[in-house]
């Protein structure tokens, strides 16, 4: 239901940033949640949000300086009604429908 563009992130170990887009292939509005395998090195904004039907949402990723290694972001998503105002609500209710893994490499 979603794709990530670009589908991976490459950063110098000294740190860096990138912009990714969560692109919806769904006919419905989606809520998303971003999880990281390395919260010490990565900062992601927004962590929760919405993507309109067939729309896209901007995701800013910052990699802080640290040891070179591979990590991942997991972007979970769930369909939500058009009038939903809290992007955290479907995940608190266990309504997750799928997820996409984004490989993050610092070298």
From Swiss-Prot:
Gene3D superfamilies referenced in this protein's UniProt entry, alphabetically: Immunoglobulins
Taxonomic superkingdom: Eukaryota
Expression tissues: Expressed at higher level in testis.
Positions in coiled-coil regions: none
InterPro entries assigned: Ig-like_fold, MSP_dom, PapD-like_sf, Sperm-specific_class_P
Domain MSP: from-to ranges: 1-107
PROSITE patterns in alphabetical order: MSP
SUPFAM superfamilies linked: PapD-like
PANTHER family linked: MAJOR SPERM PROTEIN, MSP DOMAIN-CONTAINING PROTEIN-RELATED
Name of protein: Sperm-specific class P protein 31
Biological classification of the source: Eukaryota, Metazoa, Ecdysozoa, Nematoda, Chromadorea
């Amino acid at each position: 239901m979603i794709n990530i563009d670009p589908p991976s992130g490459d950063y110098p170990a000294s740190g860096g940033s990138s912009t990714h887009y969560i692109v919806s292939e769904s006919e419905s509005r989606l809520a998303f949640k971003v999880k990281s395998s390395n919260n010490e090195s990565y900062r992601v904004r927004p962590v929760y949000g919405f993507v309109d039907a067939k729309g896209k949402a901007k995701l800013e990723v910052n990699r802080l300086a640290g040891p070179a290694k591979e990590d991942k972001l997991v972007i979970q998503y769930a369909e939500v009604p058009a009038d939903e105002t809290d992007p955290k609500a479907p995940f608190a209710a266990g309504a997750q429908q799928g997820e996409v893994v984004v490989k993050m490499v610092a070298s």
